[in-house]
């Protein structure tokens, strides 16, 4: 569970007991008495559907004039966290995270400047344009049956990228001189 005071809490016994996760490095903090508290709030938390130990977390600090993308991944159930913001826009807050239901390395993030995807688990991010204007993407949903990417924006409605499944083959395609994509009947 993520809270508006920047803390992440984890329960391993169906909510009977909760432990605070405090292993994020690189987040802005403030000193309150003897406590070193985060200035950020938790924007989004997403557990992987492929590996129960993998968790993604996005933090936001725009209320303090800081628009940096704070995006992290844990591969050990929250014991340690790796910054995966990599080459996302420097002042593009991250609002939402989605993981492909087939390829665990294909991730999508909604940012202040649109949606970005990665094929390598967050090492490299690519803007996904496809007619989408440069707008804040606040929510992302994946419609698994049709492989549609549904984007909720701030003030511009929602967009649907029909059948994004060719992105799963993109890494292989980029290595080839020529490639064919499987098409959907109908």
Task: List each language-model region with its residue ranges.
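Beta-propeller blade termini and top-face loops
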Residues: 1-186
């Amino acid at each position: 569970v993520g809270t508006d005071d920047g803390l992440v809490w984890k329960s391993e016994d169906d909510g009977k007991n909760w432990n605070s996760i405090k292993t994020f490095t690189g987040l802005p903090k403030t000193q309150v008495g003897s406590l070193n508290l985060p200035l950020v709030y938790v924007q989004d938390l997403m557990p992987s559907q492929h590996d129960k130990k993998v968790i993604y977390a996005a933090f936001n600090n725009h209320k303090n004039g800081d628009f940096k993308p704070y995006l992290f991944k844990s591969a050990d159930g929250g014991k340690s966290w790796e910054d995966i913001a990599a080459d996302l826009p420097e002042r593009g807050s991250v609002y939402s995270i989605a993981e492909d239901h087939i390829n665990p390395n294909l991730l999508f993030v909604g940012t202040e400047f649109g949606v970005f995807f990665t094929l390598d688990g967050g090492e490299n991010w690519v803007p996904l344009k496809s007619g989408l204007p440069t707008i804040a993407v606040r929510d992302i949903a994946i419609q698994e049956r049709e492989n549609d990417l549904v984007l909720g924006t701030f003030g511009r409605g929602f967009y649907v990228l029909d059948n994004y499944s060719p992105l799963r083959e993109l890494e292989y395609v980029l290595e080839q001189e020529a490639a064919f994509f499987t098409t959907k009947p109908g």
